[in-house]
């Protein structure tokens, strides 16, 4: 399995890419199944992760991590609450009624509505990949502050400056120990394998411009 950021900017090569500071930036990438196996993989197509580097929480399972490097060193990301950047979630949170209907349909035994919500979120992130198939995604991001359309939680702050050269990379981590809990909604079968593990994309150099 591979994540690849394509050279789809016709006007300039990857080595000269400029990204606008505080402007919406479209980041596109492909997920490629190089194997001869059918796979199910958890990945969110609406936004990147809102949590700090290396963190994988059940609610954010399947949210790819947008990472920035300076001279080969991973830059820190900080979380905070900035009201003017909140409220960007692409789809509204389900109501309690919708969650209870989801619980009944999927025969879940949880009493805590938060647990049901986690399963509901995960169920919307499941995609399939046939052998040799490529799926493409395009997500918007803003720098240095980012609030993910996949969540309405804390805002991320990337420690980046204008007119300096950086690299960005997309990282996806699906820990094997987390997957078993969600097997009832992922629906593994003899045909489909459930992907677990880490995938990292190629690095793309950029300069942040105001």
What are these regions (language model features)?
Residues 128-141, 204:
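Short Pro-Gly-centered flexible turn/kink motifs
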Residues 172, 177-208:
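Short Trp-Ser/Thr-centered turn/loop motifs at beta-strand boundaries
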Residues 1-22, 34-42, 206:
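Low-complexity, acidic Ser/Thr/Pro/Gly-rich terminal tails and inter-domain linkers that flank the onset
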Residues 29-38, 53:
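Asparagine-centered strand-capping/turn motif at beta-strand->loop junctions
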Residues 43-134:
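The feature marks short-to-medium sequence segments in extracytoplasmic or secretory-pathway proteins
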Residues 145-180:
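Short, surface-exposed ligand- or partner-binding patches at beta-edge/loop junctions that are enriched
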Residues 16, 123-129, 155-158, 191-195:
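Beta-strand-rich interaction surfaces with strong enrichment in secreted/lumenal proteins
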Residues 21-28, 200:
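Short, solvent-exposed loop/turn segments enriched in Ser/Thr/Gly
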